[in-house]
Swiss-Prot record:
PANTHER family per the UniProt record, alphabetical: CALCIUM-TRANSPORTING ATPASE 13, PLASMA MEMBRANE-TYPE-RELATED, CATION TRANSPORTING ATPASE
Keywords of this entry: Acetylation, ATP-binding, Calcium, Calcium transport, Calmodulin-binding, Ion transport, Magnesium, Membrane, Metal-binding, Nucleotide-binding, Translocase, Transmembrane, Transmembrane helix, Transport
Name used for this protein in its record: Putative calcium-transporting ATPase 13, plasma membrane-type
UniProt record similarity statement: Belongs to the cation transport ATPase (P-type) (TC 3.A.3) family. Type IIB subfamily.
InterPro entries assigned: ATPase_P-typ_cation-transptr_C, ATPase_P-typ_cation-transptr_N, ATPase_P-typ_cyto_dom_N, ATPase_P-typ_P_site, ATPase_P-typ_TM_dom_sf, ATPase_P-typ_transduc_dom_A_sf, HAD-like_sf, HAD_sf
Gene name of this polypeptide: ACA13
EC number of the protein: 7.2.2.10
Positions of transmembrane segments: 148-168, 187-207, 337-356, 394-411, 803-821, 833-853, 874-896, 906-926, 945-966, 977-998
Function: This magnesium-dependent enzyme catalyzes the hydrolysis of ATP coupled with the translocation of calcium from the cytosol out of the cell or into organelles.
Modified residues (N-acetylmethionine): 1
Description of how activity is regulated: Activated by calmodulin.
Domain remarks in the Swiss-Prot or TrEMBL record: The N-terminus contains an autoinhibitory calmodulin-binding domain, which binds calmodulin in a calcium-dependent fashion.
Amino acid sequence: MRRNVSDHAEKKDKVGVEVLLELPKTLSKSNKKWQLALIKLYCSRTLLNCAKHAIRKPGLFPRSLSYTAIDLDHHHGDDHFKIDTETLNDLVKNKNQEKLESLGGPNGLVSALKSNTRLGINEEGDEIQRRRSTFGSNTYTRQPSKGLFHFVVEAFKDLTILILLGCATLSLGFGIKEHGLKEGWYDGGSIFVAVFLVVAVSAVSNFRQNRQFDKLSKVSSNIKIDVVRNGRRQEISIFDIVVGDIVCLNIGDQVPADGVFVEGHLLHVDESSMTGESDHVEVSLTGNTFLFSGTKIADGFGKMAVTSVGMNTAWGQMMSHISRDTNEQTPLQSRLDKLTSSIGKVGLLVAFLVLLVLLIRYFTGTTKDESGNREYNGKTTKSDEIVNAVVKMVAAAVTIIVVAIPEGLPLAVTLTLAYSMKRMMKDNAMVRKLSACETMGSATVICTDKTGTLTLNQMKVTDFWFGLESGKASSVSQRVVELFHQGVAMNTTGSVFKAKAGTEYEFSGSPTEKAILSWAVEELEMGMEKVIEEHDVVHVEGFNSEKKRSGVLMKKKGVNTENNVVHWKGAAEKILAMCSTFCDGSGVVREMKEDDKIQFEKIIQSMAAKSLRCIAFAYSEDNEDNKKLKEEKLSLLGIIGIKDPCRPGVKKAVEDCQFAGVNIKMITGDNIFTARAIAVECGILTPEDEMNSEAVLEGEKFRNYTQEERLEKVERIKVMARSSPFDKLLMVKCLKELGHVVAVTGDGTNDAPALKEADIGLSMGIQGTEVAKESSDIVILDDNFASVATVLKWGRCVYNNIQKFIQFQLTVNVAALVINFVAAVSAGDVPLTAVQLLWVNLIMDTLGALALATEKPTNDLMKKKPIGRVAPLITNIMWRNLLAQAFYQISVLLVLQFRGRSIFNVTEKVKNTLIFNTFVLCQVFNEFNARSLEKKNVFKGLHKNRLFIGIIVVTVVLQVVMVEFLKRFADTERLNLGQWGVCIAIAAASWPIGWLVKSVPVPERHFFSYLKWKKRS
């Protein structure tokens, strides 16, 4: 039956071809070309169909040792890789070990992905793009950021805004009913316009800051990953990872995608971000081989083959349902919220009293209209007029609340933080937590690492000793050189790459590893690939920051376990303590006598005194095939000295911090002699400190002190050598207990506890692990201590800018409240209308905040003492300045309120316009005074802040428009040049007053102590 069907299909195809071949004879020339194309297409399909039927016929092809059957009906895009996306996704998500084995294990999977465990992906052509198209990119779909409309809605949730809108609606309705649409819409419409303007400015400002924080969030998630491509180890963005990539993993790294383990030693993974379990999971070729995106490497090192990226990973699917929280509230914002609430309560009380007084005066008939007639005449007054009058009073009272509540304070903090974060990125500091910006300004102690932070991290081997002799490799026996080759090539996490003959070598790994590899290749003529190919690794003990060493148990390929060799590498004095013999230059193993040991110690000390990092190599034959590496009775191969020069400018940065009252402490893993030499070179240790025996000590000694001894000595310690991450944590805790605000730098995974414990954690962007970065508040992108000093300056600038704005806004709040209250009680009316007060509110909250929040840091900030943990937010200096200016403004404006008409011989409306205009101009001139809390010269550096100048110009222009051209909207009257001159003169008087007031000394004891720094939780 099957044969008949097949024959029938063949006959049918044959007939179809014959018919098509006859068709061109009956067609016109214009259609023949199209018909021929159709024939070609039909023939192609027919031939393929015939081939398919032929292949299916049993017995047609005799079985051979190797044959391939092609199913043309089931072609997929990822057949090029011999495995489909669904299979790959299922592999890791479900830890499908059975499926992995069916693919031939990790090596078979890598082959199916057209990759290589040693060489990685071949990048030639469009291979990377093909993988991205087939398997997807390593990016996550996140919840969309908040749009502008969201912030508009948030602004309208403000109760005072809603009350004002209600008042505006009633005022609009009664105005139109009483005066008609043409004349009656002004009062209510003006309030509507003013409210919508305030809402629009607030929403746009918050929207822009949110976008800014989103951008910074994206930058912080763009981490660098080590991969192998074309046999070359290189660093790429996590977003550029593709399926098939061979990723190199070390302690502290984040796993960038889902994948399988292909090689490595003692790899332990922290999967708590995925499973919630705190226990580390071991990953190996014989057990669990699966690695999840988003997890962290807790110990060991290795390589993984990427199987799924982006949204195909379990982490990606989880992240797609999580929205970024950009509403993080800093400690300062919390304090300002409390301040705003306290002032708001005062404003509410004043507004209630004003409303009460206005209502009493209205209903007792003491208020009069513009014609001099009583506004309320008992039963003869229409109900509409009464309601309209009451609505105006309520609007005035509510507007007083709007002005009284310093809502601009949180906005000022947001603006300052957003501006500072953007500028700090240019200064090589990426802020991860907003609170760090302001807290850094209070820092009293900075605990810094040495390597890469104070030094260039450009290491080079400058000294080497073979036995007790210093010399060149050419004078050393071949046996010693071979042992060095083994000890360097097999006991490293770095790699060597050379693309083709004639090109330079490329070294990867930590700076120390690269220096050692470079020395071994160039001086000892080590062929790393050859050494690796000739030997097998039996067991590895990775570098330990406590023991300061790493080791490997290895053997030659094809040789029994009796020829195992242990190689150790690490801190010279630590390795020396493990040795009982040493190799001399000729390769003879000699017993290490006490005199020899003393001589080696002197060699180490002499190199350390030259600021060299001393690394020793030792070995021993080990016939036992066990996992515990031999740690005693080793033979010392040699000692090398690695030079890591101080960074240019680091001494100046240290001096700047010390001049600013910030104590610098260096915490390093180097020996005490190297640490002392570097500290002197960097300016951390002064000649006086060198005479102090307590200024420099080792971590073990500090660790062994009692808690009372540590607290008593910690402030005098300048350098801690041979320290562990636990020692750093101990020091941070002690300093915090003494009341210090502590900043700590760190780059390793083990630094995470100290970074979290510190008030400000500063991780290194180049050498720092992902664990360290995630535990920190700020990432120093260039690993430079000078950038740490810059962060300190920016921290002080943030705090200083916010204090400037607080002083400026509270001056306005006090003046506006007093003027309206006194006028309402005495005259039964408020000189500043709802629209005018909303305009003042706009000037203060947005334009004023923008002008004062974007001041750049000055060197004067580094001449002050640290703010500390208990400093009040509003200082005595600020109280002096704001009360003096507020008193002046209140005095002048009350004179205008009660004597303005007689002094200037003007109408009531012109008098009120004079009050409004003078009040606004006073704030403009007072913004200059607010630029400096202490300095008399408020114009210094003004030309550098174009934004400030621009805002002042815009404010003045808009004020002129409000007074001269929007008189119906703003309820003002036009002023002549003389009246403008009077307003400007009164406002300008705030400059000399500010100059004089700053000459008045203030007591050191604070007027108020309820606004204090609290410890960061």
